[in-house]
Amino acid sequence: MQQKNKYIRIQEFLKQNKFPDFRMNQIKNAVFQGRINHFNEITVLPKSLRKLLIEEFGESILNIAPLKVQHSEQVTKVLFEISGDEKIETVNMKYKAGWESFCISSQCGCHFGCKFCATGDIGLKRNLTSDEMTDQILYFHLKGHSIDSISFMGMGEALANVQVFDALHVLTNPELFALSPRRLSISTIGIIPGIKKITQDYPQVNLTFSLHSPFNEQRSKLMPINERYPLLEVMDTLDEHIRVTSRKVYIAYIMLPGVNDSIDHANEVVNLLRSRYKRGNLFHVNIIRYNPTVSSPMRFEEVNEKQVVNFYKKLKSAGINVTVRSQFGIDIDAACGQLYGNYQKNKNQ
């Protein structure tokens, strides 16, 4: 059974105790306009109500606890403790233009076992609740950060957790975080039912598909989910998403040295995408340099920059929209595929 988010529970609590509707509005305004975290500091509420709220929900609105904060150039990574003594990580990236982007986790661990990912190596501990996902953003909001964009690209597979859709509702609710759906991004390894639900319920949310190999057999070895949802079936689902939404789909491609960075791979990516451009030039490849991890199932060599450039040029010359993604936070294990791996390794020693 899906757990109701805290904002619904607070509203129901107020109604059950016969408080007027405007009290909920006062709480929302205190949190999202005044950046107030503790019920006792919402002084527009009667003291008696504050006492009842604390007894029912605890002292603070935020229900996850920051344990460790690490800083690197343009990047902050926070390790949070959630219920059950489990841990998750969130990354804040600050761009030189002033834009702030947040990479949040949707699961504690991940059971899909992609061979290049530290998070997948620890297995799935549990799905996060809607509150645990949105609280990662609330933490930064309460500290005065500008919430410019959010990616569900942290720990876990977002579309394997049904609570993600309630989190999207909370984040886009005009009375709560009030974010435009176009400032939100969902990354998936290819969970077809989840992609279809995004198409139907959140067509303006950005969608990223983790490809990492255009060859079906190799992709199955790197990403076992390909056995359940084969590449071409996923691509057909993405075609339908584009047809319905007229929105761009991003293709993430991690360059694994000596594994998937050859010109043959580049040519096959071109073949995979170019035939689909009849619906518009709406696939965009993001090339991601492999980030070394302490505990991924397979080890890979350092990225060959020449191969990255050659791969990029091959796609570009074929008319494919392509970008080489900038790297942030590698030194604090905050980059793609690194989250939680180093903490888990240290914990087990």
Curated annotation (Swiss-Prot):
Instruction: Write one Gene Ontology MF term.
Output: 4 iron, 4 sulfur cluster binding
Gene Ontology biological process terms from the UniProt entry: response to antibiotic; rRNA base methylation; tRNA methylation
| Location in the cell | Cytoplasm
User: Where in the sequence is the active site?
Assistant: 89 (proton acceptor), 336 (s-methylcysteine intermediate)
Q: Which residues bind S-adenosyl-L-methionine?
A: 156-157, 187, 210-212, 291
User: What are the UniProt keywords, alphabetically?
Assistant: 4Fe-4S, Antibiotic resistance, Cytoplasm, Disulfide bond, Iron, Iron-sulfur, Metal-binding, Methyltransferase, rRNA processing, S-adenosyl-L-methionine, Transferase
Q: Name all Radical SAM core domain ranges.
A: 96-331
What is known about what this protein does? Specifically methylates position 8 of adenine 2503 in 23S rRNA. Confers resistance to some classes of antibiotics.
Protein name, please?
Ribosomal RNA large subunit methyltransferase Cfr
Its source organism is: Bacillus velezensis (strain DSM 23117 / BGSC 10A6 / LMG 26770 / FZB42)
The primary gene name is cfr
